[in-house]
């Protein structure tokens, strides 16, 4: 995967950073998905992704969008589990079941730009070691955007960067 460069030279690959907040954010997100903690999943999502999920919920539930918007991250909002369920189901299905989510390794972060980074989800390949690209294919990518001083999972960037990298989108099976 390469990043776009405004100059005439060839695109440069993203910078790899081995200790980056997205690694912990990815682990936190996958754990929340594995244990079906809707509030924790919601807290890990970007504003745009939350809006997309609220819109998806509104369409499925046949309610006005303004009634679906503003889902509270606390367990007190009954809509939260319904809004997050399609995303969770998509991830669990794409990654082989809730019980396998803890087996994925998290790569060093790839920094696309100041506000975008991604990590690769590496399948369980045994003991900790440096792996080659062939060892982790097929893998998945999880993209983050930096907003409100946090790195948050972003559905749109994950889809876009997954396609660019030729990887399956772990969030892409969300359907009506």
Please provide the spans of the model-predicted regions:
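Lipid interaction determinants
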Residues: 3, 23, 105-108, 160-165
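Solvent-exposed, non-transmembrane amphipathic alpha-helical segments
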Residues: 49, 61-65, 73, 164, ...
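Low-complexity, intrinsically disordered terminal/linker segments enriched in charged
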Residues: 110-176
């Amino acid at each position: 995967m390469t990043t776009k460069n405004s100059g005439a030279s060839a695109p440069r690959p993203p910078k790899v950073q081995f200790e980056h907040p997205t690694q912990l954010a990815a682990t936190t997100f996958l754990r929340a998905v594995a244990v079906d903690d809707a509030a924790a999943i919601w807290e890990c999502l970007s504003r745009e992704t939350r809006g997309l999920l609220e819109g998806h919920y509104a369409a499925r539930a046949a309610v006005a969008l303004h009634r679906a918007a503003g889902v509270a991250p606390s367990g007190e909002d009954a809509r939260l589990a319904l809004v997050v369920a399609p995303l969770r189901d998509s991830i669990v299905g794409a990654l082989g079941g809730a019980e396998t989510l803890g087996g994925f390794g998290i790569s060093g972060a790839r920094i696309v730009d100041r506000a975008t980074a991604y990590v690769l989800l590496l399948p369980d390949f045994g003991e900790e070691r440096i792996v080659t690209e062939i060892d982790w294919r097929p893998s998945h990518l999880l993209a983050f955007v930096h907003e409100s001083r946090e790195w948050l999972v972003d559905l749109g960037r994950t889809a876009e960067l997954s396609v660019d990298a030729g990887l399956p989108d772990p969030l892409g099976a969300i359907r009506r």
